[in-house]
Amino acid sequence: MLYWAAVFFIIAVIAAVLGFGGLVSASASIAQILFFIFLVLFVVSLIFGVVRRPGPPR
């Protein structure tokens, strides 16, 4: 999924350089969706990292 985020980021940069045509709205909305997906995954992994701390060795 990170690969696709990088691909859509590159598409967004190319579209910005070419003058913000019709491609921008599609790539920007996909990039925005991917941003929120990765933000949620980050928060979930952060919570699981705090909750699943290993106890002291026995």
UniProtKB/Swiss-Prot annotation:
It is found in: Cell membrane. InterPro entries: DUF1328. It comes from the Bacteria. The chain crosses the membrane at residues 4-24, 30-50. The keyword Endoplasmic reticulum does not apply. Keywords: Cell membrane, Membrane, Transmembrane, Transmembrane helix. It is a multi-pass membrane protein. Its main location: membrane. GO terms for cellular component: plasma membrane. Belongs to the UPF0391 family. HAMAP family: UPF0391. This is UPF0391 membrane protein Plav_0056. It comes from Parvibaculum lavamentivorans (strain DS-1 / DSM 13023 / NCIMB 13966).
